[in-house]
């Protein structure tokens, strides 16, 4: 008698498509994945850094990266479902690389193509003196480990300011989730477009 699967797989491919930061230009991004203890990457790249991009000429002035992302995870349970953490950097008036935004989003649970717009934020100094000193020295407040963005511990005391957004597209494939008793709801409800008309 053959035993059933003991793990399920989550494969995600896609791209960090674009960003909107109205006040900034010549930006690049870094990404990394944060996941629970029962999760393990089996293939793909866990961290990456994009090229520098400039705003498109035209009305919207979008920063376009189209930077590919691909990774496969295995796990025994959905606790600690993976998140992608994105950090955006660019030059300040002195030419120093400074953080322009942090953001995170869970990878989609259901198979298929998904697009997510991630609101970005930056940490702020807690006083005017610290703000002036950090500007003068060229060292803005930033997280020593950007993965803290995906965790809740200690974030309630962090002062942040919203700044820009990043658009990411995902193509998600799962294997053996249903065999292990997890229902993502995608295969039980056919799309209205695929149902025959009476």
UniProtKB/Swiss-Prot annotation:
Residues 8-126 form the C2 B9-type domain. The keyword Cell wall biogenesis/degradation does not apply. GO terms for biological process: cilium assembly; smoothened signaling pathway. Belongs to the B9D family. This is B9 domain-containing protein 1. Part of the tectonic-like complex (also named B9 complex). It comes from the Eukaryota. It is found in: Cytoplasm, Cytoskeleton, Cilium basal body. Keywords: Cell projection, Cilium biogenesis/degradation, Cytoplasm, Cytoskeleton. One of its GO terms (cellular component) is cytoplasm. Pfam families: B9-C2 (PF07162). InterPro entries: C2_B9-type_dom.
